[in-house]
């Protein structure tokens, strides 16, 4: 099993969310081999994400990006004492089952890899291992939480070294939560109905192909064995919890475009619980220094003098990409 042995007899929601809380306030770094994993651990990372390539290289290589080779993940698991996460393609249940059997500590159902299912994300409640998923807005976040995600992260635009999309996603979620808090419960239920609509895409497409009316029957399953009304009720319950808390009910990390200590500090200043760093560490000129600096920036996010000091003599950050010039927008994957 993974380092923390958190997936005992049954992976309850409490256990899964408990693991996510254990990494709260920290930095999770993408690594592609044992040496990088050790650098991340020594720099103070709370966890590492095992990949075959960092997002910048996945973007550059093109083609179909899949789960990392098992040997690579095992090599990384054997190299460190901190928790190890790994990515699967959106909707790829079999990849997730393989990683669960391998004993990773958390699975990232990630838009960085090529999606496997054009209609649905994995029903994460069927697994013992906890999941993290990306979200651009509150609707995506609530859907992933209802499906069983123990942790949410911004999608940002991975592999760009450009923080703008992560900032966009943080603001979209935060401002939508503030709007929810001003709504009546009846209005919140209407939002739940709107947020549930993506689960109807497959059923509607089948009806269109078959020449049938678009209307979905109340007792008709549309996602696994769940009907549309059951999904709406589930999303409504989560939205009411969000309304009460004033935030997501799970740990919420920033990801996608973090490339400097100041980027990491900005995400924490905007209310994030921690930071994922993908290409920003090992595409910089001095990965060891950059890794330590970003960890320190997250620890001292509200101390500008400390951020200034740790930003000295850390070399060049990764080369950034302008979002409008991208041919492929990874953040648009998933529903």
From Swiss-Prot:
Pathway: Cofactor biosynthesis; pyridoxal 5'-phosphate biosynthesis. Pfam families: SOR_SNZ, ThiG. The active site is at 87 (schiff-base intermediate with d-ribose 5-phosphate). It catalyses: aldehydo-D-ribose 5-phosphate + D-glyceraldehyde 3-phosphate + L-glutamine = pyridoxal 5'-phosphate + L-glutamate + phosphate + 3 H2O + H(+). Its EC number is 4.3.3.6. D-glyceraldehyde 3-phosphate binds at residue 171. One of its GO terms (biological process) is amino acid metabolic process. Keywords: Lyase, Pyridoxal phosphate, Schiff base. The keyword NADP does not apply. GO terms for molecular function: pyridoxal 5'-phosphate synthase (glutamine hydrolysing) activity. D-ribose 5-phosphate binds at residues 30, 159, 257, 278-279. Catalyzes the formation of pyridoxal 5'-phosphate from ribose 5-phosphate (RBP), glyceraldehyde 3-phosphate (G3P) and ammonia. The ammonia is provided by the PdxT subunit. Can also use ribulose 5-phosphate and dihydroxyacetone phosphate as substrates, resulting from enzyme-catalyzed isomerization of RBP and G3P, respectively. Belongs to the PdxS/SNZ family. HAMAP family: PdxS (MF_01824). In the presence of PdxT, forms a dodecamer of heterodimers. This is Pyridoxal 5'-phosphate synthase subunit PdxS.
């Amino acid at each position: 099993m993974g380092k923390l042995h958190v997936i005992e007899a049954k992976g309850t929601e409490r256990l899964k969310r408990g693991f996510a809380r254990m990494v709260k306030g920290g930095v999770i770094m993408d690594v592609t081999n044992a040496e990088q994993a050790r650098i991340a651990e020594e720099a103070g990372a709370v966890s590492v994400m095992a990949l075959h390539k960092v997002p910048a290289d996945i973007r550059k290589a093109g083609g179909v990006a899949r789960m990392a080779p098992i040997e690579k993940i095992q090599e990384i698991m054997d190299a460190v004492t901190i928790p190890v996460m790994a990515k699967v393609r959106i909707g790829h249940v079999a990849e997730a089952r393989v990683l669960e059997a391998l004993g990773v500590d958390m699975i990232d159902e990630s838009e960085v890899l090529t999606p496997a299912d054009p209609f649905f994300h994995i029903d994460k409640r069927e697994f013992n291992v906890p999941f993290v998923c990306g979200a651009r807005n509150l609707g995506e976040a609530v859907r992933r939480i209802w499906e069983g995600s123990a942790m949410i992260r911004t999608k940002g635009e991975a592999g760009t070294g450009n923080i703008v999309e992560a900032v966009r996603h943080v603001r979209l979620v935060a401002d939508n939560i503030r709007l929810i808090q001003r709504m009546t419960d009846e209005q919140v239920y209407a939002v739940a109905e709107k947020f549930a609509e993506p689960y109807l895409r497959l059923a509607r497409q089948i009806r269109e192909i078959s020449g049938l009316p678009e209307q979905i029957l109340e007792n008709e399953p549309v996602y696994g064995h769940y009907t549309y009304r059951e999904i709406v009720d589930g999303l409504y319950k989560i939205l009411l919890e969000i309304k009460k808390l004033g935030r997501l009910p799970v740990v919420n990390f920033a990801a996608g475009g973090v490339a400097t200590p100041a980027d990491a500090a900005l995400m924490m200043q905007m209310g994030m619980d921690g930071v994922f760093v993908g290409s920003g560490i090992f595409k910089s000129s001095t990965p060891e220094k950059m890794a330590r600096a970003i960890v320190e920036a997250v620890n001292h996010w509200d101390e500008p003098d400390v951020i200034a000091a740790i930003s000295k003599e850390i070399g060049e950050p990764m080369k950034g990409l302008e979002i409008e010039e991208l041919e492929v927008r990874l953040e648009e994957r998933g529903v």
